[in-house]
Amino acid sequence: MLEHLDGLSTATPGDENTYLHKRLMLEVLGENVSSLDERLHEELLRRVMGTSLWLCHEDIARLVVQFCVNLMSTHTGSMLATCLEMLVESFLPPRGYPAGRLEDELETFMRSGQSPSPMRNSSVDMDEDSSARGDGDLGPPPRSAAETTVIVVGAITQILTLVPLSATVLRGVLLRRIPHKTAVKARQCQYLRAAFALVETPAGRPLRDGLLRGVLRHLLD
């Protein structure tokens, strides 16, 4: 079973058999989260929640998010912290994201006040992605920061709505994950854009004051 959860970030419909197996496995897992045990199924959980929402295909991203939301609605405890850590970590792109793309999107946003259209079929993006990953299975072209932020914030707001306890856990995660002051500007800005997008939602609004205080301390350091 675990082999079908390998390479979720790079799976594409082009490899029909493998892709369908991965999709089916995620669908089954998402419908049976109540049967999962954190200790007995640690490796399975690690593989699913380790999927990059920046790099994976749209269908895979949707199923991974649904898995996390379903998991949190039936399990709390340390699983809640683990899942929220993974989602907040996804505010920022992983290793393998095309170099310069985050900076380009920030520059566009600063100039026009709008993020680039979240399209994933640009040949430029494909070329950058090929050079960044440098392996045989390149997977789908990466999505933009704007598109990924919508996916991640949507998942977290669902969890906040379904699991009221999650707000207490998330408050600490949001502050702890703020990039270090030495991090490049684009990463710091992307994290804060995602965090503020979250706290401006009805579900995330109770976290707004705490985030503002944390960001102020971060700026004064």
Predicted regions located by residue number:
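Internal amphipathic alpha-helical repeat/solenoid segments
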Residues: M1-I60, L80-L92, L102-F109, D125-D129, ...
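Boundary/linker elements of alpha-helical solenoid repeat scaffolds
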Residues: L20-V33, L45-R46, R62-M72, G134-G139, ...
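Alpha-helical repeat/alpha-solenoid scaffolds of the HEAT/ARM/MIF4G superfamily
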Residues: G77-P118, G139, R143-D221
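Intrinsically disordered, low-complexity serine/threonine-rich segments
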Residues: S115-S117, S122-S123, S130-S131
